[in-house]
């Protein structure tokens, strides 16, 4: 039967650290070519897209939780993915981005303090469901419901072709990102303009 367990589990050593340190937001629908590990389908090895992503450093009280929701009545199981972000300091630029984030749906790469990378909202995306703006910054909650827990990313973010623009933290899969008068554009667009 497919529901039967296949492995036991020992108590691990006390060397893990809780919490998350950064997240990467990708607009929903821009991760269509996902390659899974041939042996372990809970691991994603490749993503071959040129979707723009944005990195948020979230050290401190931010968290990523996956709640198992199961019902005996209708024989269903789903995984509620909850990303709670605590963003320090207010700015007019952040206000603008929070408004956009509140209206959108995203795939989110979550990196914890143990350097595990989770791909949250892979099939259905995460959306802002709650939040607060206060004098010290922002608290934002994003939620999504998936058929499986968030997949682990088998490689590093860098191995997927992410190139981080440190000025604006724009990230581009497979294409370099360049800062141009405060707007992020891909090198291919710049080359078309220059040629």
Listing of model-derived features with the role each one plays in the protein:
Residues 2-80, 124-133:
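Solvent-exposed edge beta-strands and adjacent loop segments
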Residues 123-194:
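Mixed-charge, glycine-accented linear interaction segment located at domain edges/termini
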Residues 24-27, 35, 117, 161, ...:
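Intrinsic disorder/low-structure terminal segments
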Residues 44, 85, 191-194:
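Broad hydrophobic/π-residue packing in well-ordered secondary structure
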Residues 62-123:
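Structured, beta-strand-rich domain cores
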């Amino acid at each position: 039967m497919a529901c039967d367990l296949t492995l036991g589990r020992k108590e691990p050593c006390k060397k893990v650290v809780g919490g998350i340190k950064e997240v990467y937001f990708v607009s929903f629908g821009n991760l269509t070519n996902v390659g899974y590990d041939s042996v372990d389908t809970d691991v994603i090895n490749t993503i071959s897209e040129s979707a723009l992503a944005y990195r948020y450093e979230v050290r401190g009280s931010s968290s990523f939780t996956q709640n198992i929701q199961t019902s005996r009545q209708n024989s269903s199981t789903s995984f509620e993915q909850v990303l709670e972000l605590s963003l320090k300091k207010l700015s007019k630029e952040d206000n603008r981005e929070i408004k956009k984030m509140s209206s959108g749906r995203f795939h989110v790469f979550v990196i914890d303090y143990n350097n595990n990378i989770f791909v949250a909202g892979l099939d259905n995306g995460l959306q802002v469901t709650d939040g607060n703006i206060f004098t010290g910054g922002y608290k934002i909650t994003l939620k999504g419901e998936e058929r499986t827990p968030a997949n682990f990313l088998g490689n590093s973010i860098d191995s997927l072709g992410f190139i981080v623009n440190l000025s604006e933290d724009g990230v581009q899969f497979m294409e370099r990102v360049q800062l141009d008068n405060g707007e992020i554009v891909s090198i291919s667009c710049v080359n078309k303009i220059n040629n």
